[in-house]
């Protein structure tokens, strides 16, 4: 299945695939009122040279062997969020107007629900050579149980490489499963939080196995922690800088994180 040189303008989900194998999405531009690319239980997926602009998630996606590369994620959205419109309004092509929001919630949000069987273990998701600009967060993996789109099967591993991210507002969330802790890798990643953010954590970690940061640089004007964790796992730092005192880089959470479903 190949989508190439497509222009998605003011739709719900731009592309939605479930239970598919060997998908290529290339040279596409997404300007959507819902997720740009969505779906779960997909295997062998390539997304390359695309533009993502939405009031929801750039990708709300799950599967095995997924590569996203050479793409741009940015907000605010061209169109207002369409998720609050009724089915009739969506069917009739109604436009979302104020006070619907235009902030982009996440570059990548994990998806694994019960709509189709998930036959292979989700994991080996790689996002590389991308820019992320004015997006609330660049990962939302929330297997805490309150996000019904992320309750079927947990994610085994995800990696970000060669990422330039700026004007980020919220932590990168990796809330895995106790039965299958998530492995997270970040390599050659630069992150700058929005200047008006008074206090923020770069990573929120729960039920993680191995978290590795190589050549990662994080800056914020306000108070910053590099990692805040609730459960124990392995955290490896190599050539990392952070605009916070080093003794405040990695701290334990005082209570379990509440992850808002998005």
Each predicted region: which residue ranges?
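Extracellular/periplasmic carbohydrate-active domains that bind, remodel
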Residues: 1-262
């Amino acid at each position: 299945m190949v989508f190439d040189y497509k222009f998605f303008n003011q739709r719900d989900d731009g592309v939605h695939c479930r239970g598919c194998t060997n998908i290529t999405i290339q040279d596409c531009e997404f300007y959507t009122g819902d997720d740009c690319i969505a779906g779960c239980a997909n295997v062998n997926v390539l997304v390359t040279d695309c533009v993502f602009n939405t009031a929801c998630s750039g990708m709300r996606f799950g599967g095995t062997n997924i590569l996203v590369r050479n793409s741009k994620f940015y907000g605010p959205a061209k169109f207002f969020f369409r998720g609050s419109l009724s089915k009739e309004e969506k069917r009739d092509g109604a436009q979302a107007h104020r006070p619907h929001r235009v902030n982009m919630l996440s570059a990548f949000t994990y998806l694994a629900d019960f709509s189709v069987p998930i036959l292979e273990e989700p994991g080996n998701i790689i996002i590389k050579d991308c820019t992320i600009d004015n997006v609330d967060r660049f990962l939302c993996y929330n297997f805490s149980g309150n996000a019904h789109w992320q309750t079927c099967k947990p994610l085994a591993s995800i990696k970000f490489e060669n990422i330039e991210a700026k004007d980020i507002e919220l932590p990168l969330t990796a809330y895995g499963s106790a039965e299958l802790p998530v492995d997270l890798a970040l390599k050659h990643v630069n992150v700058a939080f929005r200047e008006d953010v008074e206090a923020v954590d770069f990573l929120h970690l729960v039920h993680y196995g191995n978290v590795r940061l190589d050549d990662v640089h994080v800056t914020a004007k306000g108070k910053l922690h590099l990692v805040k964790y609730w459960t124990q796992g392995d955290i490896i730092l190599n050539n990392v800088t952070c605009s916070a005192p080093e003794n405040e880089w990695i701290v334990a959470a005082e209570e379990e994180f509440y992850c808002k479903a998005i």
